[in-house]
Amino acid sequence: VEVAMRYQFPSIKESLLNLKNKGCEEIFVVPLYPHYAMSTTLTTENEVKRINEDSNFRLDLTFIGAFYKEDQYIQSLCNVIKNNRQEESDFLLFSYHGIPNRHLVKTDPTKSHCLKVKNCCDLDSDARPYCYKAQVIETSNLCANKLGLKRNEWSISFQSRIGPGWIEPFTDKELVNLAEKGIERLDVVCPAFVTDNLETLEEMNMQGRETFLEA
């Protein structure tokens, strides 16, 4: 088993070389993004393939797909939430990393479903395996059901937008909206990540907290 990172160390090339030197020929690659997105899952797959080819490693690569609805992932997510929720919490916000709407359209293999059919994310289609928004909605529903939450006790939003045309609702707006509705004890979970990072620790835990408290 080797760990590799896109923009840090150990690099993908270094980790693939380590596996090759160990005599491995067939490699299972697990992009640690629970939900499929062009900017994360797809670009990671393409980069691993490129390095394998350019470096002449000749490794047989198999990529493990999105795991947004796997029982183990949902249970782990629920455990994290239960272990960290405030006592007498009023509300749970599922805040996901945002992506441009155009990415949803580009990854739709049917070219006729995403953002073109009413309530597209609620309908089963050939686009779902590649639709980030539909997948995060399903993750949230599965988790909320397992936690026994009523529909008025949780919501979904998207953080880190850059410019117009990104999927909504936006987290910063939702934080203000919830505060204005009288929510006082809010819990926020970021299921798009399997580990904490600058986005969860600073943007959400610091900036998001400040936005909510000042609303």
Q: Which sequence ranges carry the predicted segments?
A:
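Active-site-proximal alpha-helix that buttresses catalytic centers in soluble enzyme cores
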Residues: 1-215
